[in-house]
From Swiss-Prot:
Keywords: ATP-binding, Carbohydrate metabolism, Kinase, Metal-binding, Nucleotide-binding, Transferase, Zinc
Pathway: Cell wall biogenesis; peptidoglycan recycling
Gene Ontology molecular function, alphabetical: ATP binding; N-acetylglucosamine kinase activity; zinc ion binding
Keyword match Transferase: yes
Enzyme Commission number(s): 2.7.1.59
Positions that bind Zn(2+): 157, 177, 179, 184
Lineage: Bacteria, Pseudomonadati, Pseudomonadota, Gammaproteobacteria, Enterobacterales
Top-level EC class: transferase
The keyword Kinase appears for this protein: yes
Protein name per Swiss-Prot or TrEMBL: N-acetyl-D-glucosamine kinase
Length: 303
């Protein structure tokens, strides 16, 4: 059995999957915020309960926001303070007497989608998250590409390309990102960015769902706004696709529920790609909230 943990600032979620990649059991507990020992106990108790329930010693994978293992072997995860700065993988492997694998939550999202029955035919899968921020992951032959610093797939911190500035207007403000850089695409393409663009052009504070509702009603300003956003997304994604050249792009996050993104994006991409490039298949994520657990569990499938 494959045990997948999706760990965040408020909850530890465990999903148990069988060899057919089907969810058999899940359970959630609150994430301890202050005590590392309590954090380890919470994970180990869930593993022990799963082992007893299924009569086996399942493999353990964990998805967590942040850098799973820094150069000194410790975790960096600002949203999980009880475990940040601690050698989480080594400590859990020792306590559970098995190989525990960690990766960041965005890679686990991408891995979950790459192992979908419909998508396993594609060697190179790119996950793109358009949510509170912009991120994602790359999966090659069923295995995450992590890189030295676990920042592969941090697409949101690429800068706006020159033709995006031409498209949006020369007086378009370059916003400072939370990472400290200026002009990161996450500030324009995330759900927050979608709402910020509306306020910038129309001087009216609305949230993304409200703007999308106006678009669905045929509001002219909302139609123009969505058209502008999709063009901006296409030019930024075109840069990424020129580097990565995936077979499939799977889009997750809150904005993935807006069908215009997956239905219209492919038609806008060719003019932002090399003439010989083929537009990849673009799909909405299939597994929703379960994706984090699925992807973490499947960190052991690539063996």
């Amino acid at each position: 059995m494959y045990y997948g943990f999706d760990i965040g600032g408020t909850k530890i979620a465990l999903g148990v999957f069988d060899s057919g990649r089907q969810l058999q059991w899940e359970k959630r507990v609150p994430t301890p915020r202050d005590s590392y020992d309590a954090f380890l106990d919470a994970v180990c108790e869930l593993v022990a309960e799963a082992d007893q329930r299924f009569g086996c010693k399942g493999s353990v994978g964990i998805g967590i926001p942040g850098m799973p293992e820094t150069e000194d072997g410790t975790l960096y995860a600002a949203n999980v303070p009880a475990a940040s700065g601690k050698p989480l993988r080594a400590d859990l492997s020792a306590r559970l007497d098995r190989d525990v694998r960690l990766d960041n939550d965005a890679n686990c999202f991408a891995l979950s989608e790459a192992w979908d029955d419909e998508f396993t035919q594609y060697p190179l899968v790119m996950g793109l998250i358009l949510g509170t921020g912009v991120g994602g992951g790359l999966i090659f032959n069923g295995k995450p590409i992590t890189g030295k610093s676990y920042i592969t797939g941090e697409f949101g911190h690429m800068r706006l390309p020159v033709d995006a500035l031409t498209m949006m207007g020369l007086d378009f403000p370059l916003r400072r990102c939370g990472c400290g850089q200026i002009g990161c695409i996450e500030n324009y393409l995330s759900g927050r960015g979608f709402a910020w663009l509306w306020q910038h052009y129309y001087h009216q504070p609305l949230q993304a769902p409200e703007i999308i509702a106006l678009w669905e009603e045929g509001d002219e300003r909302a139609q123009a706004h969505v058209d502008r956003y999709l063009d901006l997304l296409a030019v930024c994604l075109g840069n990424i696709l020129t580097i990565v050249d995936p077979d499939l792009v799977v889009i997750g996050g809150g904005l993935s529920n807006f069908t215009a993104i997956t239905t219209q994006l492919a038609d806008r991409l060719p003019r932002h790609l090399l003439p010989v490039a083929r537009v990849p298949r673009i799909e909405r994520a299939r597994h929703g909230d379960a994706g984090g657990m699925r992807g973490a569990a499947f960190l052991h499938l690539s063996d």
